[in-house]
Amino acid sequence: MTPVRRRKLFILLFALSVLSAAAALVLYALRQNISLFYTPTQIVAGEAPAKHHIRVGGMVEANSIVRAKKGLDVQFKITDFENTIVVTYSGILPDLFREGQGIVAEGEVTDNHHFHAIQVLAKHDANYMPPQVKSALADKVKQ
């Protein structure tokens, strides 16, 4: 092998090792900060890791919202129409949060049927209209 070829091979191997190290560091950082999404059925089946930051999504079950008499604690059930889990949350819920509404909760699984949320996000459809706009449009239609 000529010295020129040896030098090119050395540069190529060095570049590949630096690129591999950078990719490994990026993947390690993503693994630490990634928040995976699970359904209530997956949580009940034990597929979600316990004591690990995840997201769970589903519909708020009817007649399941229980608010504490004092404080901001709330407990409710979410379902994917196969299984149901109990979610506990301490904080102010979004304005769109209600029974029958789709939500995404971020937090940790405490056991196969309980989830402790640190953040609750209410999902809405693309046809959502604020109540003020809806009433204004209804008034215009009546005229």
From Swiss-Prot:
List positions binding heme: 124, 128
- Cytoplasmic-facing ranges: 1-8
Q: Where in the cell is it found?
A: Cell inner membrane
- Supply the alphabetized keyword list: Cell inner membrane, Cell membrane, Cytochrome c-type biogenesis, Heme, Iron, Membrane, Metal-binding, Signal-anchor, Transmembrane, Transmembrane helix
Give the UniProt record's GO annotations in the biological process aspect.
cytochrome complex assembly
Q: List the disulfide bonds.
A: none
Q: Does the keyword Membrane apply?
A: yes
Q: Name one Pfam family in it.
A: CcmE
Which segments does the topology annotation call Periplasmic? 30-143
Q: Which residues cross the membrane?
A: 9-29
Keyword Magnesium assigned to the entry: answer is no
What SUPFAM superfamilies does UniProt report for this protein, alphabetically? Heme chaperone CcmE
GO cellular component terms attached to this protein's record = plasma membrane
Its annotated function is as follows: Heme chaperone required for the biogenesis of c-type cytochromes. Transiently binds heme delivered by CcmC and transfers the heme to apo-cytochromes in a process facilitated by CcmF and CcmH.
Q: Which family does it belong to?
A: Belongs to the CcmE/CycJ family.
The entry's protein name is Cytochrome c-type biogenesis protein CcmE
Species source reads Legionella pneumophila
Instruction: Name the gene.
Output: ccmE
